[in-house]
Structure formats: structure tokens, C-alpha cells
Amino acid sequence: KTLLISPWGTAPRVTLDDTGAPRTWVYRTCFTDAFQGSALAKFAAAYMKATKAAVLYNPASEAPKSQAELLKKEFEGRGGQVVAFETYAAGDKDFSAQWKRIAEAAPDVVFLPSYYGEIPEQIRQARAAGVKAPFLGSDTWTNSELLKSAAEVDGAFFCAHYNPDAMEDKVGIFRGAYENRYDKEVPDDGAALTYDTLYLLKQALETATSDDREAVREAFSKISSFDGVTGRIVFKGGAPDPVKSVVIKQFKAGKISFVTNIDPD
């Protein structure tokens, strides 16, 4: 019996046991894959004004699969139409057949929840096949390595866990301390989430009736909200998964720019 708090584990099963019930000792401080799929659908419909979407994903990978399925469900629930729902297998190098079908479907937006190492080549093939629509990515796009493929990703939107350029005092203090420690490197999402996780644990340790494991877990379960560098983290009724905003960013002119926050409904 040990309290486990995942800063970065977005897969739905992280906090669930084999029966699908919440694990008593496991929490997370990031949003889930399902939640980001829903938020991206909301962004596509409400902000991009898209009415037709296409999806390309790897169904053998848990995170992209759950993101793709939830985006499809939410987008259709908002009155949109998913005109192509294409898949590929791990290790595939040729996506031309899928992109041809997607191009023929003429979507307004393409959701691509791929891992960053796959994305540039997939987009190159998409454009070669005649896909004109902008791309929308998951938090797998947050890796700054994608800036090396600026031409491919330019104009694409993706979701992230925090905005390092936010004006809140907590963000500035955290970023300044991190950059001083790590040679001016801007802290990424993983660093910000880990920072919030440690301060949440600190709060639980300070409010626990003792240093007993059960007492610390009980104290953590009673935290209802926490204002961190990744935004307000809300735990409803002791639930292991937080309710929090999703940050939308865009690759533009060789840089990553903040676009908006998608708040929970």
C-alpha cells in the first residue's frame, strides 16, 4: 500500500484496476487521453468551425486509440461529421492509401494523434496526396523536436498541459528557477506536471494526521483543488483523475505559440 501519483500518465487505465474500478492508492495530476480527445473535438468544432473531420491513428497504441475514439464521439455529438477514420500499424512507412482516401473525403481538419517521430513524414505524405486541411494533434506533439520539421508542422494545432508564457506568478517563478538551474532551458510539460505533483504531495504531507501511509493517502484524497503551474487542478469527490483545462498551441513560423485554453464543460 503505497500512494502513487502519476504526473504524466494520460492512459485511462492508469487509475483503474482490472475491473474498471478506481484504484484506491493511485492518482494523476494530468488530464486523461479521453479528456483531451473531448477537448480537441470542442476546439475543432467551436474554434476552428470545422464540420468535417478525418482521423488517422494506430489502434494498437492505447493513447492514440482512446483519443481518436473520444474525438470522434465528441465531434459527432457536436453536430460534426467524421468523414474518414483511418488506421495504420506500428512500423508502417507508407500511408499514401489512407491519405488518398482522406483527401477525397475533403475534411476541414485532420486529427493525427501520432508520436512525434512519426508526424513529419506522415504530414509530408498527406500533403503529397492532396490533403489541404490543417492538422490537429494530441499532447504527443508537445516535443520540441518537431520544430526541426517546421515546414511540415507549420499551422498545426495541438494540445498541451501548460503554457510556459502564462503571466501567473507561479508560472514565472517556476520557469525562472528552472531556467537558472538548467542553462536557460524552458521547462516542458513533463517538468511542469512533476512540479505540481510534488507540491500536491507536499500539501498532503503537511495536512496528514501522521506520516503513516494510510494517513497520507487519506490527506491526498481530501484535496479538492490546487492552483499549480499547469492551472487549476480539481479533484471531484476524491476522484483519482483531475478536472482541468487543456492548453491549445500552434506551430507557427518556426515557433510554438499559445492559442487558447479549453475549459471543462
Where are the regions that the model predicts?
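Solvent-exposed, polar/charged alpha-helical surfaces in well-ordered, non-transmembrane soluble domains
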Residues: S38, K42, A46, K65, ...
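Segments of small-molecule ligand-sensing domains
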Residues: Y178-A192, K202-F258
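Extracellular/periplasmic periplasmic-binding protein-like sensory domains
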Residues: A11, R23, I123-Y195, E206-D211, ...
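Sec/Tat-exported extracytoplasmic proteins
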Residues: W8, A44-M48, Y57, L71, ...
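An alpha-beta-alpha
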Residues: D18-T87, V109, L201
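Hinge/beta->alpha junction and helix N-cap segments in small-molecule ligand-binding domains
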Residues: W8-V14, R28-G37, Y57-Q67, F85-F95, ...
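Extracellular/periplasmic bilobed ligand-binding domains
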Residues: K1-L4, P64-C159
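Extracellular/periplasmic catalytic domains that process cell-envelope and extracellular macromolecules
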Residues: K1, G20-P22, Y47-K49, A103-A105, ...
